Amino acid sequence: MDLVSDLERIFHPRGVAIIGASNRPGNLGGFFLGGFLQQGYDRDQLYAVHPTEKEVSGVKAYPAMQAIPHNVDLALVFSPCDSVKGVVADCVAKGVKGVIICTSGFAENGGDGIKLQGEIAGIARAGGVRIIGPNCVGVYCPESKLINYAGWMPRESGPVGMFSHSGSMTVSMPVAASIMGIHFSKVISCGNECDLNAADFLEYFGRDPKTGIVIGYVEGIKDGRRFFRIAREVSKNKPILLWKGGTSDIGSRSAASHTGALAVKTQVWDAVCKQAGIIKVDCEDDMLDYLQAFYYLPRPRGNRVAIVSATGGLGVAMADACSDYGLELAALSQSTRNRLQGIVPSIGTCVNNPVDIGMMSSFNLQMGIDTVRALAQDEGVDIIIKTVGTSNLEMVSKEFEALAGFDKPMIYIFSRAMMALLKELKPVKGVAIYSTGRRAVQVMSKMLEYERYRSGK
């Protein structure tokens, strides 16, 4: 079996069967089928399989897989767990290429569930069929209109690939990221991994030309040596942001009951992630913040930061954050300071780094643009962080557009109150937005850590 070809058939199938879909309110298979239709999936390539239904949501239903008179590459299974073994055998007989088992009640329950899951995997393996799951919510590929769970998933494609041991995160993360203008190539809910697992998905994303950033949420790694060997290769070209759940005693017990994951000591996990060039993530906010940086910002060439603020206190606080995270304040050249003296007022300002451009800068668009441009053109500056003192989004948007194209990361700090307005602001390549200067500095430290790994330093 060729891994990439196997997964491509799952992400771009010719014919999808939804087994167990019905018109009964609350039926999960019927809900998924409706989601496919909402995404605009070709209904002529959709087939419901149910012993008594004639059609589901207007899609023709068949009593069994063998009754479908067309080719089916992908089957989604919502049948009761005690019938899934027979369903997978039917899929093998039909010539299905991939099966996504959404049904739960297998290895995560222990005992007989482990045995049944192993038997299902054996049937699929013998028949040359690849399985995602069981106990998962499927896959999401906006390019081919495949959805996991809900028809209101974003329809735009982007360069982010995701695999997750949490089904809900395969929905919440693309939706939250889309508010920032960040979109995904493919998303995979791993489930119990009776066949395809996180290492397979990481390898696939590493070889997928439509994926440039890989993110993941895991509760355990089944084949750790292979996973981290693959990660070392993938991270040379694509950043990997990885969040591990179950790091505490309580969390590890929850992970075991969730997906049957085995515990890994935190110290060991941290060490192997560092060796493999993986950017370790600790929460959803981290994931979205780091993702925004790798999605929008050019890679920093060094750790020298220029800070711009409308008040001296904010600049001092960010300087402290730089010290805490191993970043340096850039020493501005004399020519840059001379330029700044011609840009900012002479009263209540400072042209040394941190640069204090005064409160009136909140009302002067050109002053903000010229200040950042001068710093961006200083060879001694690698990163620019600027606080935003205005609530005028039109003014901020014009500043972003004027500064697009510089090859240095530009980070803007919005107040928490203003962060709620960001969905009204068009994202600009080269600019990232955070709610605190400390948060921005932390994100930059992670980007620099990744660049050091890539350069072998």
Feature map (PLM): residue ranges:
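Catalytic-core regions of core metabolic enzymes
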Residues: M1-K457
